[in-house]
């Protein structure tokens, strides 16, 4: 029997009775609840044998929930109630028994909408759990639904962008800012550890997600450790502060030291070759303009390197238009990126001989690369060598497949 029940008319509702697909195991019935809720409440009981019942709504007590808002302009309770009248309650809510009946743990929006729809009963899973387990379940469910909402919103924005063909038109339609648009679209292309924040219901905070992305780009191992820690301390400690601290930990030193034949620090190898410092004016510190995380929850400021690495992924790996990337980029980020790349353009203009040697030097010291920010730096440098007019769109367009 399908574990999802459709309740379309109150006249069709039977007396409360358990509906069982398999015998549920009581021992450790709540183990792994926070993880399982990542796929919805149904997933919580998939391995145990789902057991749910039709419970009268007037037997359910609703106590103070973590969630305070149950609707917005695009997701009203009236809309959900109308859907329930047609399709029924497709996902059971989660309850635990108490002396007066049942206490609602997760699914208050469905509970409220069912009352609006005129239902008398609702499908529910009933589980024994401690106060701590109940709070964890509420938090995991709320993070899960917020992430789903944000990702669906990001997909809708992308569809609007494709349809309208103009960033300004999308901003006007949604009455939002460019930084908001950039952050929302970034949710559609998350690396592994940042994606875990969403899939495993660790966080729905876009700032935390973006910070983990920055850490993961530099040190994937540290990013995994960070996500594991955030998952373990979810709801108990400040996630933004934790993420910002790890970002500070992994960012490169401004003045690395060479020792005993180790690789010469970035941007200094040319001195050993007796070469002219063609990159003297170029900006190498990838976090020189980044927010240090000490004043959370101040808005996150991405460094030029982070912005360029994100842009490279979107252009080269996902095939997005360079023009669209630049149009969606917040003005402050674009200004920093332009200044950063222009320094390499100026370095290229200063080279009057042996361009090949300068390029090799750039690859040796890590300034240039075949991908990421190093690829953009190389393109800007070569544009300077050729004395071509500097245009961000031309630089970005050069990294396409």
Curated annotation (Swiss-Prot):
Pfam families: ParBc (PF02195). InterPro entries: Chromosome_partition/occlusion, ParB/RepB/Spo0J, ParB/Sulfiredoxin_dom, ParB/Sulfiredoxin_sf. Keywords: Chromosome partition, DNA-binding, Plasmid. Residues 232-272 are annotated as: Disordered. One of its GO terms (molecular function) is DNA binding. Belongs to the ParB family. This is Probable plasmid-partitioning protein ParB. It comes from Xylella fastidiosa (strain 9a5c).
């Amino acid at each position: 029997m399908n574990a999802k029940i459709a309740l379309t008319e109150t006249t069709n509702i039977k007396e409360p009775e358990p509906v069982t697909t398999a015998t549920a195991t009581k021992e450790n019935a709540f183990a792994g609840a926070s993880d399982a809720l990542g796929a919805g409440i149904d997933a919580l009981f998939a391995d145990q044998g789902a057991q749910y019942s039709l419970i009268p709504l007037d037997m359910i007590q609703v106590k103070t929930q973590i969630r305070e808002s149950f609707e917005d302009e695009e997701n009203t309770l009236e809309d959900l109630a109308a859907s329930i009248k047609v399709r029924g309650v497709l996902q059971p809510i989660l309850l635990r028994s108490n002396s007066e009946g049942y206490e609602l743990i997760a699914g208050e929006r469905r509970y409220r909408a069912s009352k609006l729809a005129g239902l008398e009963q609702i499908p529910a899973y009933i589980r024994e759990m401690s106060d701590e387990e109940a709070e964890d379940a509420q938090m995991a469910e709320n993070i899960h639904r917020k992430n789903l909402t944000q990702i669906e919103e990001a997909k809708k924005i992308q569809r609007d962008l494709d349809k309208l063909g103009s960033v300004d038109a999308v901003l006007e339609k949604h009455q939002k800012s460019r930084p908001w648009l950039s952050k929302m679209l970034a949710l559609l292309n998350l690396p592994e550890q940042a994606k875990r924040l969403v899939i495993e219901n660790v966080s729905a905070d876009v700032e935390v997600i973006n910070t983990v992305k920055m850490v993961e780009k530099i040190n994937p191992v540290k990013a995994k450790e960070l996500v594991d820690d955030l998952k373990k301390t979810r709801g108990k400690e400040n996630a933004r502060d934790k993420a910002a601290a790890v970002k500070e930990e992994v960012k490169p030193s401004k003045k690395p030291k060479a020792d005993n034949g180790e690789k010469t620090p970035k941007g200094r190898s040319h001195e050993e070759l007796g070469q002219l410092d063609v990159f003297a004016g170029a900006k190498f510190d990838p976090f020189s303009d980044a927010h240090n995380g000490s004043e959370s929850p101040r808005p996150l400021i991405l460094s030029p390197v982070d912005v360029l690495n994100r842009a490279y992924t979107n252009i080269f790996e996902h095939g997005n238009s360079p023009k669209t990337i630049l149009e969606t980029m917040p003005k402050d980020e674009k200004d920093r990126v332009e200044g950063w790349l222009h320094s390499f353009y100026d370095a290229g203009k200063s080279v009057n001989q042996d361009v090949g040697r300068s390029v090799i030097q750039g690859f040796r010291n890590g300034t240039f690369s075949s991908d990421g920010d190093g690829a953009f730096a190389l393109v800007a440098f070569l544009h300077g060598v050729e004395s071509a007019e500097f245009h961000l769109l031309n630089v970005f367009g050069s990294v396409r497949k």
